[in-house]
Amino acid sequence: MTQIKLPLRSVSQINQYTKCPMAYKLARIDKVWQRPAAWLPQGTAFHAVAEAVEVWESYGMPLTLDEAKDMFRWHYANDVGAFTEETPNFEWWTWSGPYNGQRDIERRYTVGLEQVEKFFAWRGTPGQEIWVTPDGTPAIELYFEIELDGILVRGYIDAVVVVDGELRVRDYKTGNQPGDDFQLGVYALAVAMTYGVEAPKTGDYFMVGKKGKAPKPTKPYDLTKWTREAITEEFHRVEEGIAASMFDPLPEPDKCKFCDVSYSCPVFK
């Protein structure tokens, strides 16, 4: 019997296609060179530290602030090195305001260490209560893979926390606040389908805080509109567009300015 391979998707793929189908095609199908940006290693390094902080806390062996900062330094240097190996000319990196690639790497190293410090301070006031899954796993960087009517959806949930006795999905953000709650809605559904519990009704983004700004979660989003049917419909909408090779560009000045595949885009050129 022939086994049919199901398409494998993620929230980031859905968001990228919705934002600009041409960018999706260039990055995911054509696999063109992608322009690096210093905020990428900053984000991944912070996420690695935040995960480690919560994991070691759950073991009763909390990390010290100095250990967490050293961990950030290692991850940041490692990720910057990988990007630099592929794109050694910093002038080809994405600028952040007046900062070119090299200056932004230096700046975000400092910003990232400050964010680690702020995360530590926030956790002590009193921070967050991490949910423990039915199988005894702390809900930190939870992997999931669910099927939505013939489409496999997978990803990682930064944290599932307990607020006033109820579950809430949480995603850490080191940059700007997202403009929608679709990502959180998918995470809530994934928690329900994976662990057989009621889907969390709310979710939030933990804004780590840009330089000089205090960290805090956003106001909770009401996720009850993101039913399994609504989320499935969204994934299938994008899947149908990909299958039909519908990759029309959706150019806008702000989007194109920060698009990491714009140098290969026929419209941008």
From Swiss-Prot:
InterPro entries: PDDEXK-like_dom_sf (IPR011604), PDDEXK_AddAB-type (IPR038726), Restrct_endonuc-II-like (IPR011335)
Organism domain of life: Viruses
Pfam families, alphabetized: PDDEXK_1
Annotated protein name in UniProt: Gene 69 protein
Species lineage: Viruses, Duplodnaviria, Heunggongvirae, Uroviricota, Caudoviricetes
